[in-house]
Amino acid sequence: MQFMLMCRSLTYAQRTARVLERAGVTAGVARAPKSVSNRGCAYTVLVPERHGERALEILAGAGLSPERVLVKKPDGTITERDSGHDIS
């Protein structure tokens, strides 16, 4: 599984990924799937599940916060982190 940290812009996603990488957390930037984006162009920072909680703590400490936190399951379904409802 992966955490998908929704960001408001490509620049914000790149900054978020850079902060995580510097802290030793593997992170990649990708366009958000249309099924989870309520805007035309959104980006996500992808983080392995095992680093998800740590990534959120690092970002909070850096003053960065994702718009939404999603979890992409191995079967491809995407759920909101706290709600558990499928949104894909």
Give the positions of each predicted feature:
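Generic non-transmembrane alpha-helical segments
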Residues: 16-19, 23-25, 54-62
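Amphipathic, hydrophobic secondary-structure cores in small proteins
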Residues: 1-4, 8-11, 17, 21, ...
